[in-house]
Amino acid sequence: MAVPVVETNNILSHPEGGCPLQVGEGTYELKDDLHLATPPPHPSEAPIINPNPLATVPTPPTSGVKVSLVCVSPRSRTPSFISKQIVTAPPFGDGNPALVPAPVKDGLKRRKPKNNIIKSSSSFVSRVITHEVATKRLSERSPEGLFAFANINRAFQWLDLSSKQKEDPLAKILFTKAHMLCHDINEVTKSPSHIDVVMGSSAGDIIWYEPISQKYARINKNGVVCNSPVTHIKWIPGSENLFMASHANGQLVVYDKEKEDALFTPEIQDQSAEAVKASSTQPLQVLKSVNSRNQKTNPVALWKLANQRISHFAFSPDQRHLAVVLEDGSLRVMDYLKEDYYGGLICVCWSPDGKYIVTGGQDDLVTIWSFPERKIVARCQGHNSWVSAVAFDPWQCDERTYRFGSVGDDCRLLLWDFSVGMLHRPKVHQTSARQRTSMVAGSSQYGNRHRADSVGNRMRSDSQRTANTYESCDQAVRHPVEPRARTALLPPIMSKVVGTDPICWLGFQEDCIMTSSLEGHIRTWDRPREGINDKYNDQSSSTAVSASAAGSGSISGLAESTMGSL
């Protein structure tokens, strides 16, 4: 049987009149569709022939195409209402002298990784393809242009989205076997001459990459700290050196990009059998504290949350709280500065002012949770399959109204608006709420993409349990499940099928909306021009009045969750 030819070049198209997004303030027009090329397998990889869908052998972890965006000299303004309300917390590890970074000889010069990735002899990196005139393109481009970093299969691409030839990557890294599953850019250290990128792989290794100099360093090499795939990775807010990675074995690890690795041994002060057993039952096991004086090597801190995959996490705008999503359908919120835990919900994104958490997951629902009130205020029904990403649009938010979007395996992009006034408690219906069944969009061949992998861990909402008051237990507060009839239902203001493959990522920029999909399509919609609909605020307020019948309720439709004090 002939091996199919795999296209190795990206393709840029400009669909005419295709897939407009119509909302109150105007129409978002699809500007372009950048289709990333899927690289062929490395010659050393054994081809998978006729895989058995019923096989119990674990498949290699994948994540679809994720995109990290950066503008080294931002032209965009930060929405004013955000800066008014956010009070930043002290730096992570503040007070531990062992974490004070060593002084730099040239204070204006950023430290770079030591190894040249183009000339690398490492078996981890297969090869690097750079654009023949990359230096010229970098020197001639505007510093206000947008860079994008994207993963697809075993490739990692650096793209200039402000270029007319945006389909031609400035650099493409091909790894031998590992797939990059997640990546992030340091907003503190970025400049026209320096960009710090960290990326986590399916092998557990982490790459610190500086694309302008094409230097790199390998962290957690061969899983010396944690030998489990990296599921999500983010720079710690405000830090030049520290970043956090979640692993598929339920561990959260804080690394320093400039420290060497060492074989990790848990630092448990009381090694008695009773103490170890008691520690294993805690919702957050601190295997190494950020306050440890042993900070010569990685990890800086290591926490065990569960014996299952951590899917995602997000830092709150006040830089104190961390929302962590687990594969069993729960979300835990912790004060990561104090290494303390509380929480229990579904899937994660913070509002720009830190007042709300929006969640989405395997029950096909999006949920709005009030963080100050510790309760659910609305459920958002509109997806037909698992919700893969949620994000707020800060340019459409103000002190009272909020805009966010969600994407999922049903190939849909949904936009939602809600205001404080519309989130009131509805009347309790006499009839019991029927438990909703998740449906897969028949038009998508990918609807069951994740279900075979984690069907045993999938947790359904128990919508017929009655609401009770909080009850304390071992310094925790347990939130019983509330009937769905008591919870507000919020409809989307826009729902659109985008393409034919699952959508993996969603991002908002000042001038556009962007998505990426499983097969490598990066789509960009231009925002409506100013003045198209000056009456949008009036219309949205009337919409809020009509939608307010949905109301709100306390935590509902969720598995029993646990909350402790900060």
UniProtKB/Swiss-Prot annotation:
WD repeats lie at residues 225-265, 305-340, 341-379, 382-426, 498-535. InterPro entries: WD40/YVTN_repeat-like_dom_sf, WD40_repeat_dom_sf, WD40_rpt, WD_repeat_creC_regulators. Keywords: Repeat, Transcription, Transcription regulation, Ubl conjugation pathway, WD repeat. Residues 433-470, 533-566 are annotated as: Disordered. Residues 540-566 have a biased composition (Low complexity). The keyword Transcription regulation applies. Gene3D superfamilies: YVTN repeat-like/Quinoprotein amine dehydrogenase. It comes from the Eukaryota. Transmembrane segments: none annotated. GO terms for cellular component: cell division site; cell tip; nucleus. Belongs to the WD repeat creC family. Interacts with creB. Component of the regulatory network controlling carbon source utilization through ubiquitination and deubiquitination involving creA, creB, creC, creD and acrB. Required to prevent the proteolysis of the CreB deubiquitinating enzyme in the absence of carbon catabolite repression. CreB deubiquitinating enzyme stabilized in a complex with the CreC leads to the expression of genes such as those in the proline and quinate pathways. This is Probable catabolite repression protein creC. It comes from Aspergillus fumigatus (strain CBS 144.89 / FGSC A1163 / CEA10) (Neosartorya fumigata). The gene is creC.
